[in-house]
């Protein structure tokens, strides 16, 4: 169960960042800033720090300082294959505090709390935009404090170090061993806290909280992240408009349908589901609160595209609040008008202003369609099935049914079990869309063999499976191909 997680996301890729842009702005703004990184053991502080140094190493010199793990171990565990840092950027004070990657004349032989400031001052002189990371700062302090009879407090030493960093233009990262508030937060310029929780099903959720970043506007304090493949990666928002197709003369190749499955149209999701949706199965797409009105299309549009490209029929009852013309405009960008008219029918339900004729889908476009899908202005079950059968006559094999349970409540209120049997009998696939407050939400779950939930995590969008059980999956968009490709990043 492995989704792709490229080391360096190209500019055409949305939804994943290798370092939060707010923290990058914090360090590339006013010189000499100090960042305190809080978090309990196991939250990912070291990987966060290594990733930050990797990013900042492109602009200047960096040095990772520790006292508990030797250089080779740090390199093999956190750096090799994941970052561009050289071994010489990793320093173990307990082994060789003077084994520096730059030529420095240090005016003392033993390092302690008093000489630490002179040491920092000495190595900053020949360096270019130096960034120093102490992991962890308290352990470094305690290691050096043991060489004093009456050592100054960690707050005193931190004050002195932060003042020196400002004067010398050195960027500091001080890693803490706790997520609780400490007096150090009032000394430094920026504070971030890493959190991790596991629910009762073992699903891991990681969040980075931006407590304060001097000189930087924080629009979203909570940012989800992942440590997949041993790398820190932030999960970032995706503009839904970028998930939709635009006209392109290049050839688009649909994904193949395995023998017992239908491709979801999302390569990463097919991998997780061992090929895609079950033939004859029902998928429950459970929408969380605060999603935008077209968020449902992120998972559904790729499947619709793939069905139509394979000349299989699609019947769609979209949410009432969905954008008018969304499906028609997207699909017509990559499929011919003949394919759309012959194999797809959208039951128009938009509750807003009247749409232009060009955006509308004529309910009688399909040849021989003489049955209206509504009774007394409301979608009804039997006319829906009759229309689906008309689509089947002009398509190659099974159908995909995409149905908003809010929109189709009256049609399926007492017929959901019948519909599931119909889907199984014809070897079709169906996606039932529900949202908070949907009356048929529980019933949809009972007839479904797959249950996915789409929800907000900060400003980002994440997907996860309840059946089958999956980790949180950050949603991204790769726009380097003919059409936008949805990507999924495991959040572990």
Swiss-Prot record:
Residues 355-368 have a biased composition (Basic and acidic residues). This is Protein GvpD2. Induction: In PHH4 (a deletion of the p-vac locus) detected from exponential to stationary phase, most protein seen in exponential phase (at protein level). Transcribed in all growth phases, maximal expression in mid-stationary phase. An unstable 6kb transcript able to cover gvpD-gvpE-gvpF-gvpG-gvpH-gvpI-gvpJ-gvpK-gvpL-gvpM is detected, as well as smaller transcripts. Also expressed strain PHH1, which has an intact p-vac locus, from exponential to mid-stationary phase (at protein level). Gas vesicles appear earlier when grown in static culture, possibly due to O(2)-limitation. PANTHER family: PROTEIN GVPD 1, UPF0273 PROTEIN TM_0370. It comes from the Archaea. ATP binds at residues 39-46. Keywords: ATP-binding, Cytoplasm, Nucleotide-binding, Plasmid. InterPro entries: GvpD_bR2 (IPR046777), GvpD_P-loop (IPR009788), P-loop_NTPase (IPR027417). Belongs to the gas vesicle GvpD family. It comes from Halobacterium salinarum (strain ATCC 700922 / JCM 11081 / NRC-1) (Halobacterium halobium). The lineage of its organism: Archaea, Methanobacteriati, Methanobacteriota, Stenosarchaea group, Halobacteria. Disruption phenotype: Transformed H.volcanii still makes gas vesicles. The keyword ATP-binding applies. Its main location: cytoplasm. It is found in: Cytoplasm. Homodimer. Interacts with GvpE, also with GvpE from H.mediterranei. One of its GO terms (cellular component) is cytoplasm. Residues 355-379 are annotated as: Disordered. GO terms for molecular function: ATP binding. Encoded in a 14-gene locus called c-vac which produces cylindrical gas vesicles only in the stationary growth phase. Causes a decrease in the amount of GvpE protein. Gas vesicles are hollow, gas filled proteinaceous nanostructures found in several microbial planktonic microorganisms. They allow positioning of halobacteria at the optimal depth for growth in the poorly aerated, shallow brine pools of their habitat. Expression of 2 c-vac DNA fragments containing 2 divergently transcribed regions (gvpE-gvpF-gvpG-gvpH-gvpI-gvpJ-gvpK-gvpL-gvpM and gvpA-gvpC-gvpN-gvpO) allows H.volcanii to produce gas vesicles.
């Amino acid at each position: 169960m492995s989704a792709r997680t490229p080391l360096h996301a190209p500019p055409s890729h949305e939804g994943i960042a290798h370092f939060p842009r707010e923290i990058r702005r914090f360090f590339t703004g006013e010189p000499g800033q100090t960042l305190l990184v809080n978090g309990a053991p196991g939250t990912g502080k070291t990987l966060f720090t290594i990733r930050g140094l990797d990013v900042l190493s492109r602009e200047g010199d960096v040095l990772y300082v520790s006292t508990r793990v030797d250089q080779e171990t740090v390199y093999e565990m956190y750096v090799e294959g994941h970052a561009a840092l050289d071994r010489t950027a990793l320093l173990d004070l307990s082994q060789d505090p003077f084994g520096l990657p730059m030529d420095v004349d240090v005016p003392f032989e033993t390092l302690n709390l008093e000489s630490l400031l002179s040491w920092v001052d000495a190595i900053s002189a020949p360096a270019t935009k130096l960034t120093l990371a102490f992991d962890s700062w308290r352990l470094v302090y305690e290691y050096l404090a043991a060489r004093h009879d009456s050592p100054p407090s960690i707050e005193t030493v931190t004050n002195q170090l932060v003042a020196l960093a400002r004067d010398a233009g050195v960027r500091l990262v001080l890693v803490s061993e706790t997520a609780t508030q400490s007096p150090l937060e009032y000394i430094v310029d920026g504070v971030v806290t890493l959190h991790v929780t596991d629910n009762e099903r073992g699903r891991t959720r990681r969040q980075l909280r931006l407590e304060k970043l001097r000189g930087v506007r924080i629009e979203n304090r909570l940012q989800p992240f992942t440590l997949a493949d041993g790398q820190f990666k932030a999960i970032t928002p995706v503009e839904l408009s970028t998930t939709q197709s635009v006209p392109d003369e290049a050839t688009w190749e649909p994904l193949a349908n395995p023998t017992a499955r239908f491709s979801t149209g999302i390569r990463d999701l097919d991998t997780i589901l061992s090929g895609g949706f079950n033939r004859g199965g029902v998928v429950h797409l459970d929408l969380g609160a605060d999603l935008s009105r077209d968020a449902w299309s992120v998972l559904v549009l790729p499947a619709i595209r793939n069905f139509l490209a394979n000349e299989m029929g699609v019947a769609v009852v979209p949410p009432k609040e969905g954008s008018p013309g969304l499906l028609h405009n997207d699909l017509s960008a990559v499929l011919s008008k003949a394919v759309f008219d012959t194999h797809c029918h959208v039951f128009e339900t938009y509750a807003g202003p009247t749409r232009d004729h060009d955006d509308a889908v004529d309910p009688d476009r399909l040849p021989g369609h003489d049955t209206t899908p509504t009774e007394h202005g409301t979608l009804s079950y039997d006319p829906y099935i009759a229309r689906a059968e008309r689509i089947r006559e002009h398509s190659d094999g099974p159908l995909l049914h995409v149905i908003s349970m809010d929109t189709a409540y009256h049609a399926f209120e007492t017929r959901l079990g019948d519909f599931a049997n119909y889907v199984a009998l014809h070897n079709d696939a169906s996606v039932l869309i529900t949202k908070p407050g949907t009356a048929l939400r529980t019933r949809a779950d009972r007839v479904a063999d797959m249950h996915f939930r789409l929800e907000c995590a900060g400003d980002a969008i994440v997907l996860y499976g309840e059946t089958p059980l999956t980790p949180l999956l950050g949603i991204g968009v790769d726009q380097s191909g003919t059409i936008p490709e949805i990507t999924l990043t495991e959040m572990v």
